[in-house]
């Protein structure tokens, strides 16, 4: 990230280097609290103005099913970004928003005079999107002729998982859907997390400690893994939700997942059973929501709700956490999603427009020295984003050239920072 205004900041007992960062582009006041239909109309009119200014015909932005009816009701809601996905070539990004919108933004040159992010395309889901993941091959400019490459998976309550065509820039066009019904009661099992494993496979975490594995070309799961524990009376099934899957993307047959009961499991895709790696109950946290791997594959970084630390697990010594990253305060129900791409970054639970950062050497060692000494892991750098000083940074997603952040508070939006 470009850095300015260096100073020292006390963090607990250590002194961290602090920098101020200024976004070079953001959504500005687009998502400030106002009637939803006005937000949508503002985006559409801005898109039309840009088309005229640049002499380029941008796709017409899709309309919400509720756009006309909401004009009479004057419904005012915060529109918060729930997730961010970068395209494979980092030329565009997608956001999943609380107004059911799926927006694609083109990434401007930091040296240009464009400071406002406005959707290049916008489609609306029919219901609130709980989980999503973009095709690992998606690119707007180098798009494949194969529809599956230009798609996004979305999951919601009481409907099948959908693979949505991103070539259709203003309508929700489903390429295919995937069965998530429970054969015993014929009810849909909500997909709380979706992650691609390879280009042709994806995983879904759902209720009753269950992970489904899908081939993108088949409607039914090709494998299902569950977890149960032994009790004196036989097998007792935990009725917990698989809430997160690790962020790795490789041909490795082993993945990891976490539950809202603070359990972390090993997923061996060749088997049928989830293996318990660690139970993080007892630290006061209320459920895992993100798992990030170190590049060397040795350490897992587990983020939990209502926690003042990020637990570090070593899969070679799974009996207990080997260390933790210290946070300056306790998180709450809101998920602060981190990113690891050269450095490990997460928004501060205290808000104030702050980003906490740990360097690669800390993450790859788990904060353990060669002499096997455990080191306190306060952030190495504290980034301040003055434009967001009264807000909380909820999501951080980096590409090769830029860092995208989502923030909420007095207003909500997304912004781009140079790496």
Swiss-Prot record:
On whether Lyase is a keyword of this UniProt record, the answer is: no
Q: Which GO biological process annotations does it have?
A: mRNA processing; RNA splicing
Compartments, record wording = Nucleus
What keywords sit in the KW lines?
mRNA processing, mRNA splicing, Nucleus
GO CC aspect terms = nucleus
The lineage's top-level taxon is Eukaryota
Question: What InterPro entries does the annotation carry?
Answer: SWT21/TCAB1_mRNA_Telomere, WD40/YVTN_repeat-like_dom_sf, WD40_repeat_dom_sf
| Coiled coil segments of this chain | none
Q: Give the UniProt family note.
A: Belongs to the SWT21 family.
Q: How does it assemble?
A: Associates with snRNPs.
Described by its record, this protein's role is as follows: Involved in mRNA splicing. Helps to stabilize the U1 snRNP-5' splice site interaction.
What is the name attached to this protein's record?
Answer: Protein SWT21
What gene, per UniProt, encodes this protein?
SWT21
């Amino acid at each position: 990230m470009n850095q300015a205004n260096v100073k020292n900041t006390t963090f607990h007992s250590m002194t961290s280097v602090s920098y101020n960062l200024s976004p070079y582009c953001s959504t500005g006041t687009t998502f400030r609290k106002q009637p939803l239909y006005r937000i949508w109309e503002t985006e559409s009119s801005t898109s039309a103005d840009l088309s005229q200014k640049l002499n380029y015909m941008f796709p017409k932005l899709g309309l919400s099913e509720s756009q006309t009816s909401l004009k009479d009701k004057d419904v005012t809601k915060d529109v918060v970004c729930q997730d961010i996905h970068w395209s494979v070539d980092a030329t565009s990004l997608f956001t999943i928003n609380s107004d059911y919108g799926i927006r694609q933004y083109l990434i401007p040159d930091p040296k240009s005079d464009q400071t406002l992010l406005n959707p290049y395309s916008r489609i609306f889901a029919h219901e609130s999107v709980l989980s999503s993941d973009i095709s690992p091959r998606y690119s707007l400019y180098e798009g494949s002729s194969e529809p599956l490459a230009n798609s996004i998976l979305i999951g919601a309550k009481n409907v099948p998982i959908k693979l949505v065509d991103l070539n259709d820039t203003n309508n929700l066009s489903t390429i295919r859907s995937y069965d998530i019904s429970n054969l015993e009661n014929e009810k849909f099992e909500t997909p709380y997390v979706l992650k691609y494993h390879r280009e042709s496979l994806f995983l879904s975490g759902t209720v009753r400690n269950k992970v489904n594995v899908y081939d993108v070309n088949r409607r039914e799961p090709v494998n299902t893994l569950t977890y149960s524990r032994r009790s004196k009376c036989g097998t007792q099934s935990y009725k917990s939700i698989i809430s997160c899957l690790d962020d790795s993307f490789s041909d490795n047959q082993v993945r990891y997942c976490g539950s809202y009961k603070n359990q972390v499991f090993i997923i061996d895709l060749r088997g049928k059973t989830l293996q318990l790696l660690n139970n993080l109950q007892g630290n006061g946290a209320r459920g895992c929501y993100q798992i990030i791997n170190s590049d060397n594959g040795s350490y897992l970084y587990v983020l939990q709700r209502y926690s003042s630390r990020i637990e570090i697990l070593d899969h070679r010594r799974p009996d207990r956490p080997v260390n933790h990253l210290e946070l300056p305060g306790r998180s709450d129900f809101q998920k602060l999603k981190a990113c690891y791409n050269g450095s490990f970054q997460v928004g501060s639970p205290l808000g104030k427009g702050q980003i906490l950062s740990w360097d690669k050497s800390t993450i790859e060692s788990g904060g353990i020295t060669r002499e096997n000494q455990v080191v306190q892991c306060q952030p190495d750098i504290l980034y301040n984003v003055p434009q967001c000083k009264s807000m909380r940074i909820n999501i951080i997603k980096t590409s090769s050239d830029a860092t995208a952040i989502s923030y909420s508070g007095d207003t909500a939006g997304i912004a781009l920072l140079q790496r």
